[in-house]
UniProtKB/Swiss-Prot annotation:
GO terms for biological process: translation. This is Large ribosomal subunit protein uL14. PANTHER family: 50S/60S RIBOSOMAL PROTEIN L14/L23, LARGE RIBOSOMAL SUBUNIT PROTEIN UL14M. Belongs to the universal ribosomal protein uL14 family. One of its GO terms (cellular component) is cytosolic large ribosomal subunit. The lineage of its organism: Bacteria, Pseudomonadati, Pseudomonadota, Gammaproteobacteria, Vibrionales. It comes from Vibrio campbellii (strain ATCC BAA-1116). Keywords: Ribonucleoprotein, Ribosomal protein, RNA-binding, rRNA-binding.
Amino acid sequence: MIQMQSMLDAADNSGARSVMCIKVLGGSHRRYAHIGDVIKVTVKEAIPRGKVKKGDVLKAVVVRTRKGVRRPDGSVIRFDRNACVLLNDNTEQPIGTRIFGPVTRELRGDKFMKIVSLAPEVL
């Protein structure tokens, strides 16, 4: 469960290391974001010569959460850290060309097939 002020890791090679959620998109009073939801983030820590810099405000899709996701068979997939993939604000396609770490099967909708295909492992 990601809410405003939540810190997340960037799971791509866009140049961001750490980002902070500043808004959960998808409703006027929406409080929490889960895996597959789009959020607005600001870059808190970035590497030199990256595609994004500290202070940039971007969209991101949540790919891993500590809370996890419940499957219809009753199993729960949880992760150690919260992580997201940064998106281009206009096209909502990933900024980076590589994805680090596993992603869940719940991202396999039409919008995020690119992220699933770039990921090294799909759980």
